[in-house]
Regions:
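Phosphate-binding/switch region of NTP-binding enzymes
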Residues: 177-238
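Pre-Walker A adenine-sensing motif
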Residues: 1-13
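Short hydrophobic/aromatic beta-strand immediately N-terminal to the Walker A/P-loop
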Residues: 20-23
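Sensor-1/coupling segment of RecA-like P-loop NTPase cores
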Residues: 164-183
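NTP-binding/hydrolysis catalytic cores, primarily Walker-type P-loop NTPases
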Residues: 232-254
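Conserved P-loop
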Residues: 27-92
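Phosphate-binding/switch loop-helix module in NTP-utilizing enzymes
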Residues: 84-168
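Conserved nucleotide-binding/hydrolysis micro-motifs of P-loop NTPases
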Residues: 54-58, 81-85, 144-146, 180-184, ...
């Protein structure tokens, strides 16, 4: 499995298929990392389910176009908030419905009509018969905080637990972002049990918030040495890993 900045974070060229929990402060770069994670997996021809409560499919596709990632029927976009709104706040719109769709995507790659807009269904009609080979499925959730706000902690915990066990039986991997601090230590410890790897982002300097870094805290079944890796956010919405002491742009001096 490949992830953005893998070599810098782990000194490995690949890691086992994993579900990763990405934690960090507000606006530290978690959403950009998730989108870059998505772009990289699409380039690898993975089926991808992208869950985001604050964006639209059109906005996501425009961003992918802007960084040169081709549109594909393997991308499934879900905005749970839009679904609840379109249902008039209907309580029957539950997180379990999303889970069912994800499992359908695993069972029927590139033939499942997943998404908030009709574009995905049209793509599936046009291309579904051309490629029914089962591929890896990547799940990106940005963010768990928004899902908790919509569905409650218990529902989200059950959702992630089910995803975790599904990943052990199917070709499923992915990443879920969580803004911290937002859960108690005990709640976070329980959530951590449903992930194979923990990735942390932080501001490097409390004064200059342009300075950011990240580290892979652990990967189950693999010995790694956690190390902080500096990065900055690019204007095109991607993440650039910095070499120590050489590439960082001083925004104060500009």
């Amino acid at each position: 499995m490949q992830i953005p900045a893998l070599i810098e974070l782990t000194e490995r060229e690949a890691i086992p298929r994993s579900l990763i929990l990405l934690t960090g402060n507000t606006n530290v770069g978690k959403s950009l990392y998730c989108r870059q994670f998505l772009a990289d997996r699409l380039k690898d021809d993975s089926e991808c389910v992208y869950i985001n409560c604050t964006s639209t499919e059109e906005h996501l596709l425009e961003w992918l176009d802007g960084i040169g990632v081709a549109r594909t029927p393997g991308l499934h976009f879900i905005n749970p908030y839009m679904r609840k709104q379109s249902g008039g706040g209907d309580s029957s719109v539950k997180l379990s419905n999303v889970l069912t769709e994800i499992k359908n995507a695993i069972s029927n790659p590139r033939k499942s009509a997943i998404g908030n807009e009709g574009l995905q269904k049209k793509r599936g009609d046009d291309h579904g018969l051309q490629n029914t080979e089962k591929k890896d499925l990547t799940l990106i959730v940005d963010s768990l905080n928004h899902l908790i706000a919509l569905f409650g902690k218990a529902a989200v915990e059950a959702f992630i637990t089910d995803i975790y066990f599904t990943s052990k039986m199917q070709r499923l991997s992915g990443i879920c972002a969580l803004t911290t601090p937002s859960l108690s230590k005990d709640e976070l410890d329980v959530l951590n049990q449903s992930f194979d790897a923990l990735l942390e982002m932080a501001y490097k300097d409390d004064i200059d918030l342009q300075l950011r870094n990240m580290k892979m805290v652990m990967i189950r079944g693999m010995a790694i040495t956690p190390r902080w890796v500096d990065f900055e956010l690019e204007e095109d919405g991607t993440i650039k890993v910095l070499k120590k002491g050489s590439e960082f742009t001083c925004y104060v001096c500009k």
